Each structure stands twice: as structure tokens, then as C-alpha cells.
């Protein structure tokens, strides 16, 4: 397919998905610095919230350094051209959170559900559309549903009022042909005016290849993060994606040099550890496990003596999905007992 001249919208995840490896502890200064760099580089849409979306601050998901209100009210007034989005997971975020984000100047809301549970998004998508927001349905863990199944779920979200639907590879499990199959099927089923997006992770180092495959199959919104800062082995690295798009003639509107500088000079120094395809992140992609489980599994390894890799494989076998973080500890405890490892009461 000829992609030269095709325009796409790149959507930055550094300040939302990037909160996972930061344990949601990014400072306001760090947020400001990165957001202003992204804005100056020409990134049109920047997501800002707790890693698990609006209202994510909790014992289950982790308490952030600042509230969603503080992060959003700090970043939004500084933006010269970029718009700011927020993620919302029904059951974590509420319509009140949605209203708060709208009042602070968030223009895009992304309502995220597991890829078989679009029906739980109706209230939030409907509310966002009534507020006149750019309203996105976000189908997570898309490898756990067939192309036909994703079509049904995407059409539900479109019917509730979503003007864009995302196929989301939360585990970094999909390969380019699987991305193409899913994106092409959803594209064919949605109204022509409904936009289609893809969100990739780099656990099998396929983030960029999968994103290009998605564009080839009809996606026009693509998620990425500067230096890949995100759950697991990170998101699709923005600076690499932009460079590849430039080579292919795909128009992103992002400056290829400035985004490299944001990644290298602003984001890499923020990292508490290198975001790379290490043994455990690779296991996420191989076993199809939700990306933000990685740090929980590493913590459980220290506590219970079960290698994170073994735990992640078991979580994949059990079909655990986003929102079941509390089950990671339970699974580790069960495995430790089965292996005769003594665990302190």
C-alpha cells in the first residue's frame, strides 16, 4: 500500500503510560518539562493522568505524587499547540472525574475497557459526547479477541457515540499480520468518518512495525511515547516511529530532531531503570500478559521468592487482565506454597 502523503495523528503516552515505570511518582516539574518539549516538537495530542487513568490513585494501582487535577491544571495552560487527553477506565474513573477533566481543559477522553467488555463504556462515552469532547473507545488486550469479536465491540463503542475506536495491544503480544487483520476488519465495519487508532507496546520489539502495519490497514491515530517510556518494555518509541514515518512519507507533523532531543535529554534522565526488552518484559509479550503487571511481578518475586518470569507465565495461562493487579500477589503466594517456599505470615 502506498503510504506517501498519508497523514496520521501521533498521540503521546509519556506522561500517562510512562507513569507505570515511574510508579506514578512523576513530579510536576518533570511533567511540565516533558510536556513543553513534546508541544514544541509538534506532538498534537498528549495524554496526562495516573497510569491507570483518572481516579487511579489507590492501594490497588498505586498512589501518585500528585492528583490528576494537579497534573492536568499544571500542563494544560502551558500548551501552545498540543491538546491534552485523559484515560478513563470505567470502574476506576467516574463521570465526575470526566467532568473535572473537561472543566480543566481536557479535549480528548479515552474510555478503556477489556476487549470483550465494551458494554461497560456506554455511560462514560455517552457523557463525554454530551460534553462535546473528542471521545475515544479504547479496547485493551486486543490479542485476547478475534478480529470478528473486536468488530462487535468496536461497533458498540461507535454506537454509544465514540468518534474514534482503538485496537490496543496492551501486552505487546501481537505481530504485524495479526495487527493488520484486526485493524482491517474494524476499519471495514466502522463508519468512514469514525477514526481508528492503534496502541502498541515494545515487549517483542514490534511497536514500530505494528504501528506501520496498523497505518497500512487503515488506522490514522497512533500512540507512542518518547524514549518508549511506558509499561513493560515500553510503548512504541515516538522518536523511532516519527523517523520511520518520515522515511516512508507518512506525515506526522512532528519534528524528527526535536522529538529525539525530548527523548534523549528529557525522558531518559527520568527513568528509574532502563526501559528495554529484558527477560521479564519479553515474557509479557511472549505470554500475552498486561504490561503494567511487570513491576507488580518483580515486587512479588522479592517478597515470595517466585521468579517474575514464572509468575508472568502463570498469569498469562490464567488469562488475567488489566484491573486484576491484586491477583498477582495471590497467585505468587499460591505458587510459593506449592513449591514449598516458606512465606512470612
From Swiss-Prot:
Please name the GO terms that the record assigns under molecular function.
2-isopropylmalate synthase activity; 4-hydroxy-2-oxovalerate aldolase activity; manganese ion binding
Active-site positions on this chain: 20 (proton acceptor)
Read off the SUPFAM superfamilies from this record.
Answer: Aldolase (SSF51569), post-HMGL domain-like (SSF89000)
Q: Where is this site: Transition state stabilizer?
A: 16
Q: Which family does it belong to?
A: Belongs to the 4-hydroxy-2-oxovalerate aldolase family.
UniProt xrefs under HAMAP family? HOA
The protein's name is: 4-hydroxy-2-oxovalerate aldolase 3
